[in-house]
């Protein structure tokens, strides 16, 4: 499919401007090289606050890019009032299904969010577009394509004894990029565990280093927090480099631990979950598994997009492992297909046993108590898809997933 065709598939054939006049998406794809998808809501104070600065940025760069507003407004009149103040385009209000697909595709968890994509390929250029606008308000670094880790991290790194070393010393090592701050209680809790994980990994003979990218609000709090850590940090004074690292990995919240391989490629963005799950670090460097067991630690991933969850009777010994083996070939195939296109898989895959967390999930989503129970949960759309049969086979799972991806299944409300 051609570039404009990919954009039409993503956004539909028509967008609207502030006067509700239609704009042709295929023509848009031929006119600009970048599209900024602005996820927001007219009832959100942060969304209202960002408009003046974003308008200035847009006026300076509109010959090279277009912004498309993707609304979360529950009321069309409020949407119309908000869109009226925007110099850019918007997804039509009635395109609610397409809006949800965009939220899921780009793993939007909070608003406002601004995602820059290539118009020709619809591949993501920058996940943290609002930070990009703040860092480069004149658009001097356009087109902001992702740079390799070694280039973004380049420069001196420090230890808490004030010793300095060049970032080039990280070459050939696994690296954990740790986004954290003293003012954040979950960060401090994770740091205590991470100090022990760091020690165990180093003692096992692995070449591993952690680099702190601070989100502290003062140099004093940074120094106090960093004094507890045996690893490296980007100097607090180097705000530009800290910001570039946040942009590179699309950081939306802390704590966040990104694990890189010795070539600087991302192994997992779920370092926090892995450190807390694998206390002895026996599975380091924590390559992602196609199917994982749903726990309190990773349940937050249910909010990242549609998730296939197979509920099983965990009192039956070996049932969870058998369920994983049943799903795994299907999960691997889907993950590989989308990885080849440099895309995230459209589904995450979980097996859920019986515990308090699973009971709470069943209650929240109003699922029957049956086991096995095959479901797809889409929390952002508040929708569920349920396959309640006596026996779950690979053929049933494959058919269920295929029909979901083809949008042939009828959702039930959560």
UniProtKB/Swiss-Prot annotation:
Main location: cytoplasm
Entry-linked Pfam families: Thioredoxin_6, Thioredoxin_8
Keyword presence, NAD: yes
Localization: Cytoplasm, Cytosol; Nucleus
InterPro entries xrefs: NRX_PDI_b, Thioredoxin-like_fold, Thioredoxin-like_sf, Thioredoxin_domain, TryX_NRX_thioredoxin_dom
Gene knockout outcome: Depletion causes significant defects in head formation with absence of eye structures.
A single GO cellular-component term on record: nucleus
Cysteines engaged in disulfide bonds, as pairs: none
Thioredoxin domain residues: 131-305
Enzyme class, spelled out: oxidoreductase
Catalytic activity of the protein: [protein]-dithiol + NAD(+) = [protein]-disulfide + NADH + H(+); [protein]-dithiol + NADP(+) = [protein]-disulfide + NADPH + H(+)
GO BP, sorted A to Z: cell differentiation; circulatory system development; negative regulation of protein ubiquitination; negative regulation of Wnt signaling pathway; Wnt signaling pathway
Molecular-function annotations in GO: thioredoxin-disulfide reductase (NADPH) activity
Keywords in alphabetical order: Cytoplasm, Developmental protein, Differentiation, NAD, Nucleus, Oxidoreductase, Wnt signaling pathway
Entry's EC annotation: 1.8.1.8
Free-text function comment from the UniProt entry: Functions as a redox-dependent negative regulator of the Wnt signaling pathway.
Family: Belongs to the nucleoredoxin family.
Name assigned to this protein: Nucleoredoxin
Protein species of origin: Xenopus laevis (African clawed frog)
Upper classification of the organism: Eukaryota, Metazoa, Chordata, Craniata, Vertebrata
